Amino acid sequence: MTKSNGEEPRMGSRMERFQQGVRKRTLLAKKKVQNITKEDVKSYLFRNAFVLLTVSAVIVGTILGFALRPYKMSYREVKYFSFPGELLMRMLQMLVLPLIISSLVTGMAALDSKASGKMGMRAVVYYMTTTIIAVVIGIIIVIIIHPGKGTKENMYREGKIVQVTAADAFLDLIRNMFPPNLVEACFKQFKTSYEKRSFKVPIQANETLLGAVINNVSEAMETLTRIREEMVPVPGSVNGVNALGLVVFSMCFGFVIGNMKEQGQALREFFDSLNEAIMRLVAVIMWYAPLGILFLIAGKILEMEDMGVIGGQLAMYTVTVIVGLLIHAVIVLPLLYFLVTRKNPWVFIGGLLQALITALGTSSSSATLPITFKCLEENNGVDKRITRFVLPVGATINMDGTALYEALAAIFIAQVNNFDLNFGQIITISITATAASIGAAGIPQAGLVTMVIVLTSVGLPTDDITLIIAVDWFLDRLRTTTNVLGDSLGAGIVEHLSRHELKNRDVEMGNSVIEENEMKKPYQLIAQDNEPEKPVADSETKM
C-alpha cells in the first residue's frame, strides 16, 4: 500500500509537467500565428515554390487525366498530349549518365581508402537490412490479407513474358558489372538471348529395330543420326544504360584518383567541376519539372485500361501491395532513421518532398537522381561526399519497394493457382526476391526478368505474370517512390554514422593546406625583402 501511495504523487507530478509543456507549446504556437506577416507568407511561398508547384502538378494532372478519359482519345492523341512529360523524362535521363560518373568519381576521390571502406560497409549493411525487412513485410501482408482467393480463370491477362533462366540472368548481372567497352556501356547492356539450333545426335545401330535392319542390309553404315532441336543461350544486347557497369568502373576510378594525391589533382578538379555543372543544369530543369509531371500523370491516366477489367482479386492485390509499401515507407524506414540518428525523420522527409513527387511522376529512381541530389544537399544539408558516394550506388542496387513487390506478387500468383507454399519455399522466395532486387539494375527489363527468376525458383507458372501487368504501371510508381525514400534516408544514416571519419578527413585536408602555405612562405618573404615598398594588395590586384 505504501508503495502505491508513493507512486501516485510521482504520476501526478509527471502529468502536471506534461500539461505545462503542452500549454507552453500551445502559447508559443499562438504567438507565432499572431506574428505572421505578409512578408513571412511571401518568403515561405518563395522558399517552397518548387514543392508547392510539384504537388499542384500532381493534383491537376490527376484531375485532368480523369476529366479527359470520357473523350476516348486515340493512342496518337495521347502521345501528343503527353509530349511535355516525355521531354522531362528525356532531360532527366540526359543528366543521369554524367551525374552518376562525376558524383561517384569525386565522392570516392574525396575519401581515403579507410573512410570509403567503412562508409561502403555501412551502406551495404543498411541496404541489406532494409531489403530483407521489405521482403518479410511483403510476405506477412500477403499471407494475412490473402488476395488470391478464388480462381484465375476470370482474371484479365495482358502482355507476354520472355522466359529466362536464373543462371543466365545471374551471369548477365556479373557480365554487366565489367563492360568490355565503356562507350557502349553508356547505351547498351549485355543480355543473353536464346535461339533454336539443330544438333545431329548419333544412334547406335544395335539400339533400335530399324538400326538392326539397316545393319543387316548395309554393314558399311555403323550409325544413324537424328536431328534434335534445342534452345541455346547466345550473346546479345538491349538498349539502355549499363548503370551497374558504370558504377563499378566509376568507384574504382575514383578510388585510384584519390590515392594518386598531387598527380590526380587535375582529374579530381575536372570531375568536381563536371559535377557542379550538372547540378546547375538540374537547378534549371527543376523549374520545368512541375509541368512535365502534370502531363506525365495525365497521359498515364488516359492510357490506363478500363477499370472494369480489374476484378476483385487484382483489386485486393493492389491494396495489399499499397499497404505493404506504406508500412515500409511510413513506419519502418522513418523508425530506423530515428533509432540510428535520434533525429526527427519527418523533418528530413519534408526536405525530400519534391524528389518523392518526381519519383511518383517519372516512375524511375535513376531519372529522379538529379532531383534527389538537390534535395539532400540543399534542403537537408547532407555532406556532398556522402551523397556522391551513397546515392548512385543506392539508386542502382537498393530497391526496397521492388523486393517487397516481387515477394508479395510471387505468393499472390501461388494463391491464385491454389498452390500451397511450405516454409522452405517461402524462405526460397525471400532469398531470391532479395537477390533479384539487388541485381535488378544489371538485368535488362528488370521488372519482368527478376519476377520470372523468383517464380522459377519455386516452380510457379511464369506466364501468370500477365495477370498483374494491368496494374503494374501504377504500383511501379509507388515502388519507385519507396526506393528513392530508402536511398535518401540511407544517405542520412550513413552520414550520421560516418561523421567522425568526415571530421578527421576535414582536419587532414586543413593540415595539408597549412603545410602548403608554410612551404610557400619563404618565397613570399624573399619577394618582400627584395621589394619592400610593394604591399600585398598590389600583388593580388595584378593577379
From Swiss-Prot:
Binding site for Na(+) 1: 394, 398, 483, 487
Tissues in which the protein is found: Detected in brain and cerebellum. Both isoform GLAST-1 and GLAST-1A are expressed in bone and brain. In brain isoform GLAST-1 is highly enriched in the Purkinje cell layer in cerebellum.
Membrane topology (UniProt): Multi-pass membrane protein
Entry keyword set: Amino-acid transport, Cell membrane, Chloride, Glycoprotein, Membrane, Metal-binding, Phosphoprotein, Potassium, Sodium, Symport, Transmembrane, Transmembrane helix, Transport
Catalysed reactions, semicolon-separated: K(+)(in) + L-glutamate(out) + 3 Na(+)(out) + H(+)(out) = K(+)(out) + L-glutamate(in) + 3 Na(+)(in) + H(+)(in); K(+)(in) + L-aspartate(out) + 3 Na(+)(out) + H(+)(out) = K(+)(out) + L-aspartate(in) + 3 Na(+)(in) + H(+)(in); D-aspartate(out) + K(+)(in) + 3 Na(+)(out) + H(+)(out) = D-aspartate(in) + K(+)(out) + 3 Na(+)(in) + H(+)(in)
Localization terms from the record: Cell membrane
GO MF annotation list: acidic amino acid transmembrane transporter activity; amino acid binding; glutamate binding; glutamate:sodium symporter activity; high-affinity L-glutamate transmembrane transporter activity; L-glutamate transmembrane transporter activity; metal ion binding; neutral L-amino acid transmembrane transporter activity
Written domain comment of the UniProt record: Contains eight transmembrane regions plus two helical hairpins that dip into the membrane. These helical hairpin structures play an important role in the transport process. The first enters the membrane from the cytoplasmic side, the second one from the extracellular side. During the transport cycle, the regions involved in amino acid transport, and especially the helical hairpins, move vertically by about 15-18 Angstroms, alternating between exposure to the aqueous phase and reinsertion in the lipid bilayer. In contrast, the regions involved in trimerization do not move.
Protein's UniProt name: Excitatory amino acid transporter 1
Organism from which the protein derives: Rattus norvegicus (Rat)
Phylogenetic classification of the source organism: Eukaryota, Metazoa, Chordata, Craniata, Vertebrata
